[in-house]
C-alpha cells in the first residue's frame, strides 16, 4: 500500500513538474511561449534557429487560418444569388487578403524597429517581437473563426 502511494505521488510530481509549454503542439504553435521555446537552444546560434523554427510554425498556422477565413466567407455567400450580393464575395475576399498583407507588413516593420541599432541581442529582439505579433494575429483569427 505504501509503495502504491509513493508511486502515485511520484507520478503526480512528474505531472506537476511538466512545463505548461508542453501543452502546445506544432498544430497550435501559438500556445508556445516564445521565451521558453527560444531558450531551448544552448547558445545564441541554437536560440536563433529555435526562433526561426517557431516563426515558421507560426507563419504556417496564420496562413492556414487565413485560408479557413476565406473558405468561411465563400460558405457564407454560397447560394446567395440575388443581385445585391453580386460581386460582394469577391470584395470580401480582397478585403481579407488586403488586411492580411497589411498586417504582415506591420508585424515585419515592428520587428525591424526592435532590431534597429543592432547589438548582440538585436536578432533575438526581432524574433521576440515578430513571434509575439504572429501569436496576436493568430488569436485574432481564431476568435473570428469561432
Regions found by a protein language model. Name each.
Residues 1-12:
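Bacterial N-terminal signal peptides that target proteins for export
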Residues 10-21:
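Bacterial N-terminal signal peptides
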Residues 23-146:
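N-terminal alpha-helical modules
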Residues 1-2, 20-26:
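N-terminal Sec-dependent export signals
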Amino acid at each position: 500500500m505504501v509503495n502504491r502511494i509513493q508511486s502515485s505521488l511520484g507520478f503526480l510530481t512528474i505531472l506537476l513538474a511538466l512545463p505548461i509549454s508542453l501543452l502546445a503542439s506544432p498544430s497550435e504553435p501559438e500556445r508556445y511561449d516564445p521565451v521558453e521555446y527560444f531558450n531551448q537552444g544552448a547558445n545564441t546560434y541554437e536560440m536563433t534557429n529555435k526562433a526561426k523554427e517557431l516563426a515558421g510554425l507560426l507563419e504556417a498556422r496564420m496562413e492556414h487560418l487565413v485560408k479557413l477565413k476565406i473558405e468561411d466567407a465563400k460558405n457564407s455567400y454560397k447560394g446567395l444569388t440575388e443581385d445585391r450580393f453580386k460581386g460582394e464575395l469577391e470584395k470580401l475576399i480582397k478585403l481579407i487578403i488586403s488586411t492580411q498583407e497589411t498586417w504582415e507588413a506591420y508585424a515585419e516593420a515592428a520587428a525591424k524597429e526592435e532590431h534597429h541599432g543592432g547589438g548582440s541581442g538585436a536578432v533575438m529582439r526581432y524574433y521576440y517581437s515578430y513571434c509575439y505579433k504572429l501569436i496576436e494575429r493568430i488569436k485574432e483569427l481564431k476568435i473570428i473563426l469561432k
